């Protein structure tokens, strides 16, 4: 608790007929009363220090929770001390208790001291008003920091001369620690003062006890009142939140037995500090047992064992024979001799190792060398480590002092050698210590660079140099450069100068990938099979092999692991490391635009791999904290040189590694320097060829290394073929592995013309979904390119020879011909592909094909292809080539219909031909039968049936229906919650859908735009001029007798005559590029797949049920059948409110993609969010239970349906049998749900909510959010589908959500509705997901996208939709609306910058059932509905005041005539609500206030700037209210409270300087002269806090009461006259809101300001008749 001034009502003691002398003497005969006014100066003069001593200790603990008998056993201690002190420059500290009190308390035999109250008085020993200040702090120095130590603090102005403060800490302290409680005092302004300047008195009251209680309840109230009545200001303690410690790690090892142990160092480092002196730093601390000299039973022999056997023996002799000095001197001499012998051995080892050549410095690439200077270090002598002064120890000190562990010096030195740390590790150790010291990374790094010189830290300790030389035979000792050399090259260490990079053949031969061939080494390279790409140890000539291998692995891994919402680029970025990562980072940092262009082509892993291949290991290291390591790597990079041609490969690998570490991978200077560092015979030639081939140094070192490796390979090949050049000049060929015979390269090509006879030659690529066998030996453990038995099947081995890709053979049952491939030679393919013709470029291409130029994959709309030769380019490359792309004109609806009709005509003509042929064949058959059967006189006519309409029927078109043979299905067609169940005929021969007019309502039928002529099978003609309206939905009855997915029926014509049939024709069957397959027992619908039974199946099912069998579909459903959610075609305006005029194809495509992924729709299971709710339980031991609720049959039916849906969507699950909780679920049917015909389940989580910690996350303020969009002109509104269900639940919280219903006990997997903390948790989820989008307003699950113009809105929607895809949430399709000029949001309607109440709220208020007002719930519902209109009706709170009184306990429910007049008046006011406006951000704000006994009123006025004239002022809002009970306030109190209320109402507009106008002159003068600071009344203090809390500077301005026109009316009963003044002809009464601030806009011509007093009579003349007329009406 922070010590702050008491903010309650101050009280002062006044005397009645009593002198001050009597009060000072403590007489009780005076009459004392509490009044409100306080005279501070008088109180200071009457202040008496003894008032502190007058506080009774027993009164403080009078009402303790313990019994009085036990209370007597407690010791209550009161301490008082007073002293004069001098505090000028330094701080003064004193203990809270006098020393004699602390001593007496300790002798009481108690353990704890509870501090009940502390009071301190400070009085200046000088004259008043000298401009000084005093700060007092009550603290506990048991803590190390002031923030935790502070119990309370206060500063006071000594102008008054004195001050008294008190605090009730209410905590206990251990008796021995009472001296830690202190009072600290500092002063300002006493710098030139001499002598005692302050007198301090301290009073404490506490209680001694032997046991600590769980809670002390002390009687503070009476004491506080006593102190407050004497003018003492309260001091409150400080509260510190422990949230910064949440989630910290607890070290359990601290529980181990570390008794009598201490941390002692084992290493010391002496170095030169910044001041030129020497400093000592210890490190390598270890836990060591220490001897406690107070223990009498300690075993001295056990302590002596720590010194080792040798020392133990000598110490034993020391106690018996020698003096301490002699014995210690002998020990030191022995140690010195052993040390010198060890150093001699190690120096010999150094000389031997210095002859060896260096392969490379074993530096840590992740650390840095700094350029600051370091002092010269010599070997540390034992004497310099403080091992002197043994002779100063006496016998007693040796016996009682703890002796640390001693070891043989040889063992110590050997352990140091084994524990040797490299230079980089030393830097890390020092940097870690600096980081702990400063607590800031940048500050620690700065101190590291300032203090230490990395060139010299290697020689800091000679023991480390010895260890380094002994562990690496190839490293030579370093030498310090000469001080006088200043050139960069000369200033380097010897091992950093340019030198020849050599390889130790003995060490190299240990690598399993090398084998010795003659005098050279041949590399048998096997690429790593890891999905993480690391080329640090890969020779450059095998980079391609490794990259190709990695490409196949990482692509398969991505396809296997990818999920919706995963970012491919982030995932692939985690699959590279080492120098690859460094170079990739470096390239991106310098080519950000190119990188973004690659990302824009689509999320394909091939693009990322291609980027790594082309740019050769690129990325961006922007971490500036690695500058020291970069400098070290840069110096090593410049030191590299190669003179031996056979060592070019390892030299380039090292050069590339150092360049990537130094971030010089794309530095032109270092790329060119790579060629210069090569052997002269090679470097000049390859450099010239590199430039000649058109390469640039800007391509990077990776490209240069690859070019050099390729160039050397070509030279070696040429040398091998020609065999004429001397091998001396091409000595590097010994390190290059070449292929003896060059073979033609082969590639895979998709099979376009399948030939059954060549099936054995077809292959396919490996698939992660199927088992793959080797193409050669059929082994599942490897593929053909790595087959160890490659030549067992030489025919197949020769077929794949030269093929770089992995392949597998075609299985015998594999019929996926589209994925069959054939192997062809590359030359043949190029010759075939390079046929010359005139290309015709169009938008679009194959998705699995790359660009012919850049080899990147692109999306369909970003691809250009030639339809003749199928050559395909990306949009970027086509723009660079300036190709002329033919825009394919999208056919109109009429053209599409004409084309369809033409196609149908051709089909019908073909069918007619077939039918004629069948008729002819039938006639021939009849003639044949007639000739054979002559004995029959009559020929039986073959009955024929027709399924088409006949023209010769007048009333009805007869059809012969055989349901056992035709494809008839049960369907449901619906529109606007009205549906019909009809038996339909699936007829693929019918061109259109045709329905009988008697089967559907007449309201579903529209006239066609033109008459359609239809021909039947018998060529009869029919004219169709009616069709069904759009948006008719069609559902099929499924096997389980439920109707499935809704399909769009499409264009359906109404038959001209009744047929009693519904024919589903070709138009529906081929709708949405799908198809319908008709089987005997069922039909299958492709794309939107479903299986629906026909009438034949129903007969079979009925037969099967009678004989105990199963329906055929339940036992005969194809294995491949799976219900796929229907993909609705995107129709912009009806579905999402999208304007056809926008025409932004990319936005439409994006919406279609989101619909396809399910992110726009009504299926909550499509969400891919990973957000997990973290609800905190207060008491985990509580069981949540409930009583059983009876359910009606209707409730059970609802439960059965909705619970099944929740289970199918996996939102809930069956509860665990061991679950301890259950919450009741019940059905709610209110008006809105009855209209929608969907009752909902409600869960009573009240007990669970009571047992949960409240989530502190704030829900946004509605008014503040509305103000953010006042400039927007175009909106899009979205709503998340079942918003809370997007959040997952932690496993340990799921059981708490278990609920019971008629169907059983179930547990939620996602966050259910009804959890109290769910809105806050969901708002946090929305802020984390979309909070950075400044144009998106988020209010729980409502999202509003607001933009200034249409173009900006399109870009905002694209960004928003991409974020939706990343987050994986589902937007409700029904509630999504885009490109709106006006929108309803948060209860208001926004249009053209104006805000009005939503129309449906107005309708609800006007149409509210008046019969419900006589009931308490009905009246409460009506008043709650009126809260939405508070911001739009003046004085509404005053108007509805009588109605609120009816809701009380004693309120009368029955409405009388006046009550009904209030209701009717409210309805009239609601009908007059007009749109409102808000002040602009640049406007200057003025608040005008006035007050009366009836209430207060305020007006918000705005103008363009502070200095604009009054004619520019406009009223932007107003507020009013009452003061509740009538209080005995003065007029000044009312005016002050009116300003406070106005500041609170208009707080959101007060973010800058403003002006307050009031007709109270006392307030204006008091503020300007700061006289208000001397007042202690609560309202003045509250006014001061309101004025200063936000840091703005208000200006007070006084106006005369007759000019304070509108605020004056707002604060009185006659405030309704304002509206009468605006509308003199009106006879209605008006009122102004009493609780809410209401934005309002009035034109400048109607400004309320009155310039002169002369105009007042004019207004009075208008007002008086109106008042009289209104009074008569009300009477």
UniProtKB/Swiss-Prot annotation:
Catalytic-site annotation from UniProt: 987
Keywords: Aspartyl protease, Capsid protein, Endonuclease, Host nucleus, Host-virus interaction, Hydrolase, Metal-binding, Nuclease, Nucleotidyltransferase, Protease, RNA-directed DNA polymerase, Transferase, Transport, Viral movement protein, Viral penetration into host nucleus, Virion, Virus entry into host cell, Zinc, Zinc-finger
EC number(s) given by UniProt: 3.4.23.-, 2.7.7.49, 3.1.26.4
Domain Peptidase A3B: 970-1077
UniProt short sequence motif Bipartite nuclear localization signal 2, positions renumbered to this chain: 744-760
Residue stretches making up the Reverse transcriptase domain: 1208-1390
GO cellular component, one term: host cell
Zinc-finger found in the keyword field: yes
Residue spans of biased composition, Polar residues class: 7-21
Residue ranges with Basic and acidic residues bias: 476-485
Keyword Heme: no
PTM text: Polyprotein P3 is proteolytically cleaved into several chains by viral protease.
Coiled-coil intervals, chain numbering: none
Sample GO molecular function, one term: RNA-DNA hybrid ribonuclease activity
Transmembrane segments: none
Motif Bipartite nuclear localization signal 1 in this chain: 479-499
Catalytic activities: Endonucleolytic cleavage to 5'-phosphomonoester; DNA(n) + a 2'-deoxyribonucleoside 5'-triphosphate = DNA(n+1) + diphosphate
Lineage: superkingdom: Viruses
UniProt record, GO biological process: proteolysis; symbiont entry into host cell; transport of virus in host, cell to cell; viral penetration into host nucleus
Stretches for region Disordered: 1-29, 468-491
Primary role: Capsid protein self assembles to form a bacilliform capsid about 130 nm in length. The capsid encapsulates the genomic dsDNA. Following virus entry into host cell, provides nuclear import of the viral genome. Virus particles do not enter the nucleus, but are targeted to the nuclear membrane through the interaction with host importins.
Assembly information from the UniProt record: Interacts (via nuclear localization signal) with host importin alpha-1a.
Protein name listed in UniProt: Polyprotein P3
Organism: Rice tungro bacilliform virus (isolate Philippines)
């Amino acid at each position: 608790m922070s010590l702050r001034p008491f903010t309650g009502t101050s009280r002062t003691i006044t005397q009645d007929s009593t002198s001050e002398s009597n009060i000072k003497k403590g007489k009780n005969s005076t009459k004392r009363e509490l009044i409100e006014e306080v005279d501070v100066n008088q109180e200071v003069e009457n202040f008496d220090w003894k008032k502190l001593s007058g506080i009774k200790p027993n009164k403080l603990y009078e009402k303790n929770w313990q019994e009085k008998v036990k209370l007597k056993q407690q010791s209550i201690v009161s301490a008082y001390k007073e002293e004069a002190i001098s505090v000028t420059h330094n701080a003064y500290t004193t203990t809270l208790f006098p020393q004699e009190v602390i001593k007496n308390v300790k002798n009481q035999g108690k353990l704890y001291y509870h501090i009940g109250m502390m009071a301190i008085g400070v009085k200046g020993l000088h004259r008043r008003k000298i401009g000084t200040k005093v700060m007092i702090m009550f603290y506990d120095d048991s803590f190390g920091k002031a923030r935790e130590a502070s119990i309370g603090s206060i500063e006071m102005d000594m102008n008054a001369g004195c001050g008294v403060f008190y605090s009730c800490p209410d905590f206990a302290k251990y008796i021995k620690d009472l001296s830690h409680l202190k009072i600290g005092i500092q002063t300002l302004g006493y710098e030139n003062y001499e002598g005692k300047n302050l007198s301090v008195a301290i009073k404490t009251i506490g209680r001694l006890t032997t046991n600590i209680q769980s809670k002390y309840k002390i009687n503070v109230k009476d004491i506080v009142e006593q102190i407050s009545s004497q003018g003492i200001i309260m001091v409150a303690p400080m509260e510190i939140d422990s949230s910064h410690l949440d989630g910290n790690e607890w070290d359990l090892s601290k529980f181990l037995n570390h008794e009598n142990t201490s941390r002692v160092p084992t290493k010391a480092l002496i170095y030169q500090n910044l001041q030129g002196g020497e400093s000592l730093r210890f490190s390598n601390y270890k836990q060591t047992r220490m001897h406690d000299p107070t223990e009498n039973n300690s075993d001295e022999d056990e302590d002596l064992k720590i010194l080792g056997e040798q020392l133990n023996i000598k110490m034993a002799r020391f106690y018996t024979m020698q003096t301490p000095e002699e014995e210690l001197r002998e020990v030191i001499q022995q140690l010195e001799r052993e040390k010198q012998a060890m150093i001699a051995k190690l120096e010999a080892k150094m000389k031997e190792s210095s002859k060896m050549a260096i392969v490379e410095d074993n530096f840590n690439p992740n650390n840095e060398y700094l350029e600051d200077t370091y002092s010269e270090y010599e070997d540390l002598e034992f004497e310099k480590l403080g091992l002197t002064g043994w002779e100063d120890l006496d016998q007693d000190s040796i016996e009682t002092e703890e002796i640390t562990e001693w070891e043989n010096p040889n063992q110590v030195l050997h352990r140091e050698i084994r524990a040797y740390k490299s230079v980089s590790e030393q830097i890390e150790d020092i940097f870690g210590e600096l980081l702990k010291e400063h607590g800031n990374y940048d500050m620690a790094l700065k101190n590291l660079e300032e203090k230490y010189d990395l060139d010299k830290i290697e020689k800091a300790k000679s023991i480390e140099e010895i260890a380094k030389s002994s562990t690496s035979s190839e490293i030579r000792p370093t030498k310090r450069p000469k001080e006088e050399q200043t050139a960069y090259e000369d200033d380097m260490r010897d091992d950093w100068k340019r030198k020849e990079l050599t390889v130790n053949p003995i060490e190299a031969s240990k690598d399993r990938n090398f084998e010795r061939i003659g005098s050279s080494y041949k590399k048998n390279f096997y690429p790593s099979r890891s999905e993480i790409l690391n080329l640090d140890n890969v020779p450059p000539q095998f980079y391609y092999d490794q990259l190709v291998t990695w490409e196949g692995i990482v692509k398969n891994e991505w396809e296997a692991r990818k999920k919706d919402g995963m970012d491919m680029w982030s995932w692939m970025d985690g699959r590279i490391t080492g120098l690859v990562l460094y170079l990739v980072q470096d390239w991106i940092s310098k080519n950000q635009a190119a990188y973004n262009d690659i990302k824009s082509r689509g999320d394909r892993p091939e693009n990322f791999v291609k980027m790594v291949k082309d740019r050769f290991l690129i990325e961006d290291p922007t971490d500036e904290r690695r500058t020291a390591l970069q400098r070290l790597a840069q110096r090593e990079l410049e030191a590299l040189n190669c003179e031996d041609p056979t060592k070019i490969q390892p030299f380039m690998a090292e050069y590339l590694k150092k360049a990537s570490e130094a971030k010089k991978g794309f530095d032109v200077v270092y790329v060119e320097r790579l060629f210069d560092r090569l052997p002269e015979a090679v470097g000049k030639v390859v450099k010239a060829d590199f430039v000649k081939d058109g390469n640039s140094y800007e391509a990077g070192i990776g490209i240069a290394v690859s070019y050099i490796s390729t160039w050397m390979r070509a030279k070696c090949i040429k040398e091998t073929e020609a065999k004429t050049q001397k091998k001396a000049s091409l000595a590097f060929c010994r390190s290059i592995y070449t292929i003896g015979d060059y073979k033609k390269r082969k590639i895979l090509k998709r099979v376009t013309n399948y030939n059954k006879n060549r099936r054995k030659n077809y292959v396919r690529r490996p698939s992660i979904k199927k088992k793959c066998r080797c193409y050669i030996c059929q082994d599942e453990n490897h593929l053909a390119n790595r087959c160890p038995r490659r030549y067992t099947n030489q025919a197949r081995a020769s077929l794949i020879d030269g093929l770089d890709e992995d392949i597998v053979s075609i299985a015998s049952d594999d019929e996926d011909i589209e994925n069959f491939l054939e192997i062809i030679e590359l030359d043949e393919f190029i010759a075939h592909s390079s046929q010359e013709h005139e290309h015709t470029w169009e938008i679009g291409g194959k998705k699995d094909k790359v660009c012919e130029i850049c080899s990147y994959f692109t999306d369909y709309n970003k691809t250009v292809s030639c339809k003749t030769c199928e050559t395909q380019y990306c949009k970027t490359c086509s723009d660079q080539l300036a190709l002329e792309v033919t825009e394919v004109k999208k056919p109109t609806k009429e053209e599409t219909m004409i084309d369809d009709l033409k196609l149908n005509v051709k089909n019908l003509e073909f069918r007619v031909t077939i039918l004629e042929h069948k008729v002819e064949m039938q006639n021939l058959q009849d003639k044949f039968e007639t000739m054979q059967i002559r004995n029959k006189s009559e020929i039986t006519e073959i009955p024929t049936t027709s399924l088409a309409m006949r023209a010769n029927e007048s009333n009805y078109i007869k059809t012969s229906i055989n349901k056992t043979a035709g494809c008839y299905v049960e369907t449901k067609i619906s529109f606007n919650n009205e549906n019909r169940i009809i038996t339909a005929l699936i007829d693929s021969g019918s061109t259109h859908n045709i329905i009988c007019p008697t089967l559907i309502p007449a309201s579903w039928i529209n006239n066609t735009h033109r008459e359609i002529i239809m021909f039947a099978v018998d060529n009869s003609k029919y004219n169709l001029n009616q069709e069904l309206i759009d948006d008719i939905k069609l559902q099929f009855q499924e096997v389980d007798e439920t109707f499935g997915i809704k399909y769009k029926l499409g264009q359906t014509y109404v038959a001209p005559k009744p047929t009693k049939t519904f024919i589903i024709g070709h138009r529906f069957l081929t709708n949405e590029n799908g198809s319908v397959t008709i089987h005997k027992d069922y039909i299958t619908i492709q794309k939107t797949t479903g299986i629906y039974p026909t009438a034949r199946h129903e007969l079979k099912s009925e037969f099967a049920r009678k004989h105990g069998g199963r329906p055929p579909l339940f036992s005969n459903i194809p294995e491949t059948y799976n219900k796929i959610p229907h993909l609705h075609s995107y129709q912009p305006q009806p579905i999402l409110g999208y304007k056809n005029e926008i025409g932004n194809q990319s936005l439409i495509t994006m919406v279609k993609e989101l619909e396809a992924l399910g992110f726009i729709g009504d299926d909550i299971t499509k969400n891919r969010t990973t957000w997990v709710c973290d609800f905190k339980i207060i008491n985990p031991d509580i069981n949540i239970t409930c009583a059983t609720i009876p359910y009606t049959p209707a409730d059970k039916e609802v439960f059965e349906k909705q619970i099944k849906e929740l289970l199918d969507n996996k939102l809930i699950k069956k509860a665990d049998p061991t679950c301890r909780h259950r919450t009741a679920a019940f059905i709610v049917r209110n008006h809105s749900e009855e209209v929608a015909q969907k009752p909902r389940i409600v869960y009573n989580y009240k007990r669970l909510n009571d047992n949960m910690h409240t989530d502190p996350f704030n829900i946004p303020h509605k008014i503040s959010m509305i103000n953010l969009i006042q400039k927007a002109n175009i909106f899009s509104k979205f709503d998340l589908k079942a918003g809370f269900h997007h959040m997952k639940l932690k496993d340990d919280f799921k059981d708490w959500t278990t609920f019971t219903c008629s169907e059983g006990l179930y547990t939620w997997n996602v966050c259910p509705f009804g959890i109290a903390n769910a809105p806050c948790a969901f708002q946090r989820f929305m802020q984390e997901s979309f909070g950075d989008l400044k144009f998106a307003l988020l209010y729980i699950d409502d999202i509003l996208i607001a933009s200034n113009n249409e173009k900006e809105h399109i870009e905002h929607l694209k960004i928003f939709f991409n974020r939706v895809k990343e987050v994986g949430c589902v937007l409700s399709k029904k509630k999504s609306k885009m490109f709106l000029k006006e929108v309803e949001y948060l209860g208001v309607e926004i249009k053209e910058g104006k805000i009005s109440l939503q129309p449906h709220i107005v309708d609800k208020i006007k149409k509210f059932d008046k019969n419900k007002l006589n009931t308490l719930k009905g009246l409460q519902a009506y008043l709650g509905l009126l809260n939405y209109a508070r911001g739009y009706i003046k004085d509404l709170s005053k108007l509805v005041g009588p109605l609120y009184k009816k809701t009380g306990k004693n309120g009368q429910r029955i409405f009388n005539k006046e009550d009904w007049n209030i209701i009717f008046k409210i309805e009239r006011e609601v009908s007059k609500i007009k749109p409102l406006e808000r002040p602009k951000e640049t406007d200057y704000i003025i608040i005008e206030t006035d007050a009366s006994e009836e209430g207060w009123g305020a007006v918000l006025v705005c103008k363009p700037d502070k200095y604009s004239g009054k004619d520019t002022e406009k009223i932007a809002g107003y507020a009013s209210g009452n003061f509740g009970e009538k209080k005995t306030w003065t007029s000044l109190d009312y005016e002050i409270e009116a300003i406070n209320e106005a500041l609170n109402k208009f707080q959101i507009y007060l973010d800058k300087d403003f002006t307050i106008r009031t007709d109270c002159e006392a307030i204006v003068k008091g503020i300007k002269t700061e006289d208000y600071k001397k007042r202690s009344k609560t309202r003045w203090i509250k006014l001061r806090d309101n004025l200063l809390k936000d840091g703005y500077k208000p200006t007070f301005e006084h106006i005369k009461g007759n000019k304070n026109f509108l605020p004056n009316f707002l604060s009185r009963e006659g405030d309704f006259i304002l509206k009468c003044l605006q509308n003199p002809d009106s006879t209605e009464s008006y009122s102004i809101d009493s609780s809410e601030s209401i934005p309002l806009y009035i034109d400048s011509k109607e400004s309320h300001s009155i310039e002169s007093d002369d105009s007042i009579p004019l207004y009075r003349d208008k007002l008086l008749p109106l008042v009289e007329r209104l009074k008569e009406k009300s009477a």
